[in-house]
Amino acid sequence: NIDWIKETSTSKLADDVGYVELDERDLYLMFLESYGTTVFQNPTYFAHIRPGLEQLSEVAEKYGWYTATGIYQAPTFGGASWLSHATLMTGHWISTNTHYHKLLTTNSKTLALWFQNSGYRATALLPGLKREWPEGKFYGYDKVWNAKALSYPGPPFGWWEIPDQYSLAFFYDKEGAIDLRDPLFSFFATITSHMPFHPLPPIEQDWPILLSSEPYPNVEKVMKGNGVLYGQDLQTSYSQAIIYDIQLVSDLLRLTSHQNPLVIALGDHQPPAMIAGANAPWTVPVHVFSQDQTTLDRFNSAGFVRGLIPNNKTLGRLDELHQLILNTANASKQTFNYQN
């Protein structure tokens, strides 16, 4: 029975309020593909990614960011990222495709619409999107940067072709770097850490090269590794792909350190069972970054811990994180308190 979707999507709150307050600060919401709590709970994976987390922590400290981390339950495992996206964006628990398609027929208010109603430009960065996407109208984005819009001129890496670092560089150049603009709500679904986790693009330190006509020269050796991996090789590639996207978060913190945004980076689901294990919990890490400590106070009050290493406590489900984001964004104006 999914009638509850229509019952809650037309709540009095949505009709009467319809806006949020974040002091016109940008909000970057990054879903890191296949970033599950197995990276912390499996000692082998944690040993691999720990240097990347330490580097991210150093970048955050250098550029004046405070950090907090928690664990949330995802509605899916090993795939079907769109279910987690829809759950967080709407505050409804969307755990099946039936629920998802039913949701699209409702007038549920998404995070994009909340911020858009407050004067924000709502954008989606979806480098893995290569087809028509009617769902975009439901979410209410002003602009969807799909694979075609990103105009990637380089070699294809893996199944999804476009490296996340290129996507971020292109998007920031077109949207985030503009001085005189409306505040930005940005949803970014990464793809480089998608199964099969290779070949992995090199990290480019010289960002202007990413926006040149040849963003990845001399990668023949990397591309020769574009085969099927199994067992330990697959697990190693998974760790390396996660490190890549952790580096991507570092890049975003550096790029935007002069703009004081709120950055939320989280997993969409655990990796497949061959990586996480068949009995792994359906949980994902959530990292919050802000240069204003008071912004993190509400997350800390909800059980988040300081830094990038979560404790083992699951704080709730991703539909509940939706409300926490609204409460945090609107803390100075009004506290949202509704049930889904």
Each predicted region: which residue ranges?
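Solvent-exposed soluble domains appended to multi-pass membrane proteins
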Residues: 9-340
